[in-house]
Amino acid sequence: MISVNEMGSYVIEEMLDWSEDLKTEVTKLNSGATIIDCGVKAEGGYEAGMYLARLCLGDLADLKYSTFDLNGIKWPAIQVATDNPLIACMASQYAGWRISVGDYFGMGSGPARALGLKPKELYEEIGYEDDFEVAVLVMESDKLPDEKVVEYIAKHCGVEPENVMIAVAPTASIAGSVQISARVVETGIHKFESIGFDINCIKSGYGIAPIAPVVGNDVQCMGSTNDCVIYCGETNYTVRFEGELAELEDFVKKVPSTTSNDFGKPFYQTFKAANFDFFKVDAGMFAPARVTVNDLKSTKTISSGGLYPEILLESFGIRNV
């Protein structure tokens, strides 16, 4: 079986070799753990973001920069294509590990989750578990992890601290924006899973999403980065669905973000109105704007949702001068 941590370790080695070009900073802690700063104190940028996205996906997707038409503005975007959608997106990329140690907090994603089984139920559902001596993690945080954080991660992953490798970028950074937009395919799969769809029938995935500019602090950027997927994220999935076509159509109708009661305005406004309490925001909003599914069994293709660039432009706060 594919080891996402082994695949990720090769990407880390590339990042170490090209650190100066990527504008990242590498730190070796006393424990021997490797920390790669992609935007906390280091400058980082688009290429660092591309490497972060590769890490998150266990290097099991083809990633390319592209452009997206936002009402006449050619905007940077990222394309994602994978023939291993469950392992790449759910076993690796999904940000399913909230790491809180002392005053440190970050969202953990990437290969190391498959060692710690974060969360266990998901790995049982897709039938995947990794076994590798190195733990590779991507942290979305505005702080660099210290020895206590490394020790916590090593313990949960069953590896030695010296074999922990962490790449870090805050939400409010170009690298952070890139890796979040690269979650467009994963976001759709997660929404499918949340409405009771058997995600094991998904054979491949493709998606494209614009990349948010840095619009403010981490909370404000959390709004704009999510909006890239919510309002202009577009995904295509190839599935082999064993049920009736009408049942598949019903699932596809429920996936796009347009089905959410909170749809229609920049996410930061919704989040602020909810007193910045995620539990008061409709989870159904976290989905691509448009979803298309090609079913290999029926050979039919179904599409639902739409793109809303005007809301994304509002979220970005672009001023024409």
UniProtKB/Swiss-Prot annotation:
Q: Which UniProt keywords apply?
A: Cytoplasm, Hydrolase, Methanogenesis, One-carbon metabolism
Q: Give the catalysed reaction(s), semicolon-separated.
A: 5,10-methenyl-5,6,7,8-tetrahydromethanopterin + H2O = N(5)-formyl-5,6,7,8-tetrahydromethanopterin + H(+)
Where would you say this protein principally sits, based on its record? cytoplasm
Any one Pfam family match given in the protein's UniProt record, by short name:
MCH
Protein's GO biological process: methanogenesis, from carbon dioxide; one-carbon metabolic process
Q: Name one GO molecular function term.
A: methenyltetrahydromethanopterin cyclohydrolase activity
Q: Which InterPro entries match?
A: METHMP_CycHdrlase
EC numbers listed for it are 3.5.4.27
User: Which SUPFAM superfamilies does the protein's record reference?
Assistant: Methenyltetrahydromethanopterin cyclohydrolase (SSF56199)
Gene Ontology CC: cytoplasm
Which Gene3D superfamilies does the entry link to? Methenyltetrahydromethanopterin Cyclohydrolase, Chain A, domain 1, Methenyltetrahydromethanopterin Cyclohydrolase, Chain A, domain 2
In terms of CDD domains, this protein maps to: MCH
> What are the boundaries of the signal sequence?
none
Q: Where in the cell is it found?
A: Cytoplasm
* Annotated pathway: One-carbon metabolism; methanogenesis from CO(2); 5,10-methenyl-5,6,7,8-tetrahydromethanopterin from CO(2): step 3/3
User: Domain of life here?
Assistant: Archaea
Question: Function, please?
Answer: Catalyzes the reversible interconversion of 5-formyl-H(4)MPT to methenyl-H(4)MPT(+).
Name the family the entry cites: Belongs to the MCH family.
Q: Specify the protein name.
A: Methenyltetrahydromethanopterin cyclohydrolase
Which organism does this sequence originate in? Methanosarcina acetivorans (strain ATCC 35395 / DSM 2834 / JCM 12185 / C2A)
